[in-house]
Amino acid sequence: MKTLSEQQRVSIVDASTAGILKNMPAAVAEKDQHITDALHALSQIHIVHSANQVNRKRGDSQPQSIDVATRMVFAGGTCLSKAYGLIERMSEDIDIKIVLESPPEGYAFPNTLGERGRLKALHKAVEDALTGLGFQFVVQVDKDNPIRRDGSRYYCLLVSYEAHFQDTAGTLRPQLKVELICRPPIIPSEMQSLGYMLEVLSGSANPFVFSMNCITVAETLAEKVLSLLRRCA
């Protein structure tokens, strides 16, 4: 099962002792390490499917087939925290918006490949990426894991890691919830740099940084306001 390395554990203890974590418990820094590792793994996933030219004629200079991407965009409150540093909170949720690119005019996918097939290919890649890091599926007695709804347009996976630090408040579970929703952003996404919270707080001279497609702040805030209005209606 995925757990911190000895060096990572020592770094968190040292940071806590030095007051670098401020009032945050060590379990928060630990969970951020695992969330960041999971996000990095997701950022490395590249899913494409071939679309073939329709009614191709002899001598046509256009390519016979082209690759069409299935993209992931990091979203939600955790994105506001990790990508933009706008909120200071810990979440076990990794919210992802899925963008299914369409073939250009004159091209089409094989009849055997539909939206559900493209989504399932992405879900399988996500599962392989996370289990490859050592995360394990959470076994739930009363629920399936992962959960798929709406023709696989909604997908939710719970994975666990081995916790070294205990959260005395009991609010942090050694789990991550990864939600993928097939709903493209309205505003074009942005590439943002992500890294470990501990390295940011400690001012590391050589931090681990990677890039990931992220939803814009404006769209995230609009979604939060809309969600609040629906709850109050």
Give, region by region, the residue ranges found by the protein language model:
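Generic detection of long, well-ordered alpha-helical segments
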Residues: 25-32, 115-123, 215, 233
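Active-site nucleotide-donor binding segment shared across nucleotidyl transfer reactions
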Residues: 43-104
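Catalytic cores of NTP-dependent nucleotidyl/adenyl transfer enzymes across multiple folds
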Residues: 36-40, 123-233
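N-terminal regions immediately upstream of nucleotidyltransferase
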Residues: 1-61, 108-114
